[in-house]
A protein has these predicted regions:
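Active-site and donor-binding regions of nucleotide-sugar-utilizing enzymes
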Residues: 1-112
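Donor nucleotide-activated moiety binding/catalytic core segment of transferases
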Residues: 2-9, 175-218
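Short active-site oxyanion
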Residues: 12, 70-75, 168, 205-208, ...
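A donor-sugar binding/catalytic signature common to diverse glycosyltransferases
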Residues: 14-20, 25-28, 33-38, 196-241
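Helix N-cap/beta->alpha junction signal
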Residues: 18, 78-81, 173-175, 213, ...
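Conserved catalytic-core segment of nucleotide-activated headgroup transferases in glycan assembly
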Residues: 97-183, 256, 316
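C-terminal amphipathic helix plus adjacent low-complexity
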Residues: 113, 259-260, 264-334, 338-342, ...
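Catalytic binding pocket for nucleotide-activated donors in carbohydrate/polymer assembly enzymes
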Residues: 215-284
Length: 361
C-alpha cells in the first residue's frame, strides 16, 4: 500500500489493470493522470457498478464509501461496442474512454511470440503434437461448492465424450478455481497435468475453443479460432449473473448444453457464420494498430507532457486513424526542421496488479 501511495505521489502517469482502492479514494495532485486498462477483453458478464446490490456485486454503500472507479483520466476499451457497457460498469462518461484496444491484443496476434509459446507448450506436452487436432476447454470460475461440483461433472462428461482417435483435449481451469491444466490424448485415463500455461497460451496450439461465460471468446476471435459454448448450467448462471450482450443471439459461436453436442459440432467441422464473427470482432476487439502497446507508450508520454490531444477518445477515433508517427511523417519537411523535438521526459508509470476485480473473466 505504501509503495502504491508513493507511486501516486511521485508519478505523472499511473497505469492500472484492475480496481485499485487507493486510485479511487485518495485526493491526488491535479496534474496526475490515471489510465485504467481493464484486464479483460470485450464486454460480456456484468461487473462493477452494473451489479451493485446484486448477487456477486458490491453494495451501493460500499461503492460510495470507497468511491469505486473514481479518478480515472482515461479508460481503455477493446472496441467501440464495449464503451456504453463499460461506462455503466465504471460510472464514467463515454467521452473518457479510449477504444484503441489493450496490449494483450498484441500478444494474441504476434506470430513470432505465438510460435515461441507453441514451442514451449509442445516441449512440455509433446503428446499434443501427435497429428490430431487440439480442443481447448477453458470454462470460467464458479462461486459455490454446488456450482463447482456441477462444473466438475460437466468437465468429466466432455472428457468422456471426446473422440481421441481424431482429437486431443486440453482442459484449462480458471485461475480462481485451481489454475490446473489437464491434457487428454489416447483416452481419458491417459492424462498429463500441470500448472504451466494460461488459456491464452494454449490457444497457440488449439484448433477449437470450448468455453461458457468467459471473455476467452474475445481472445479466440482475435486468433480466428472457432468457438463453442458449453452452457450446461446456463439457466442458473444467466439468471444470477447477467450479461451486457444477448448471450443466445449475439455471440458468434455454436451452443450446446451437453458434451455430445459440442463434440458433434467439432467433429462435423461446424462453426459460426464467418460474417457474424467478423462483425462481432470489429465491434468488440477492433485491432486498429499493428502495435497497440506502442500507441500506449506514446499516449503515456503525451499525458506526462500535457500535450495529449484527445484523438483516441470515444466519438473522436475512427477506423482510418493513423499511428502518430505516420501523421508526423505526412507533415511538411520544413515544419519538421523548424520544430525541434521536445526534451526527453522521464515518465514514471505505476502499474497496479495487486487489487483486481475478477468478475468479468
Amino acid at each position: 500500500m505504501f509503495r502504491q501511495m508513493k507511486a501516486f505521489a511521485t508519478s505523472k502517469v499511473v497505469v492500472l489493470d484492475g480496481y485499485c482502492v487507493l486510485a479511487s479514494m485518495l485526493r491526488h495532485k491535479k496534474d496526475l493522470k490515471i489510465i485504467q486498462i481493464w484486464h479483460a477483453l470485450g464486454a460480456f458478464k456484468k461487473f462493477g457498478r452494473s451489479v451493485l446490490d446484486k448477487e456477486g456485486g458490491k453494495s451501493s454503500k460500499t461503492a460510495k464509501a470507497f468511491k469505486m472507479h473514481k479518478n480515472y483520466s482515461l479508460i481503455a476499451a477493446s472496441g467501440d461496442a464495449c464503451v456504453p457497457f463499460f461506462s455503466e460498469a465504471f460510472g464514467q462518461p463515454e467521452s473518457r474512454f479510449i477504444p484503441i484496444g489493450i496490449p494483450r491484443m498484441d500478444y494474441l496476434t504476434d506470430k513470432e511470440e505465438n510460435a515461441r509459446v507453441r514451442g514451449n507448450i509442445l516441449l512440455k506436452y509433446p503428446q499434443l503434437d501427435n497429428g490430431r487436432k487440439n480442443i481447448l476447454y477453458a470454462p470460467t470460475f464458479r462461486d459455490t461448492d454446488e456450482d463447482r461440483a456441477a462444473l466438475a461433472a460437466a468437465t468429466k462428461e466432455l472428457v468422456n465424450k471426446a473422440n481421441y482417435s481424431d482429437f486431443n483435449l486440453i482442459v484449462k481451469h480458471h485461475v480462481v478455481d485451481s489454475n490446473k491444466e489437464q491434457i487428454y490424448t489416447d483416452s481419458r485415463m491417459n492424462m498429463a497435468e500441470g500448472e504451466n500455461f494460461t488459456a491464452m497460451d494454449f490457444m497457440c496450439v488449439a484448433d477449437y475453443v470450448v468455453t461458457d461465460y468467459s471473455s476467452v471468446i474475445y481472445e479466440a476471435l482475435l486468433k480466428d479460432l472457432p468457438i463453442y459454448i458449453y452452457c450446461f448450467d446456463s439457466d442458473k448462471y444467466i439468471d444470477e449473473r447477467g450479461f451486457y450482450i444477448d448471450f443466445w443471439t449475439d455471440l458468434p459461436a455454436l451452443y450446446s448444453k451437453n458434451a455430445k453436442g459440442i463434440c458433434d459440432f467439432i467433429a462435423s467441422g461446424m462453426r459460426a457464420n464467418s460474417e457474424k464473427e467478423e462483425k462481432f470482432k470489429k465491434a468488440y476487439v477492433n485491432k486498429r494498430f499493428d502495435s497497440i502497446t506502442a500507441e500506449y507508450g506514446k499516449l503515456i508520454d503525451e499525458l506526462a507532457r500535457g500535450v495529449y490531444d484527445g484523438r483516441y477518445n470515444y466519438g473522436v477515433i475512427s477506423d482510418d486513424v493513423q499511428p502518430q508517427e505516420e501523421q508526423e511523417s505526412a507533415a511538411d519537411d520544413h515544419n519538421a526542421q523548424e520544430s525541434p523535438d521536445d526534451p526527453a521526459v522521464n515518465t514514471e508509470t505505476a502499474v497496479n496488479e495487486e487489487e483486481t476485480e475478477n468478475e468479468q473473466d
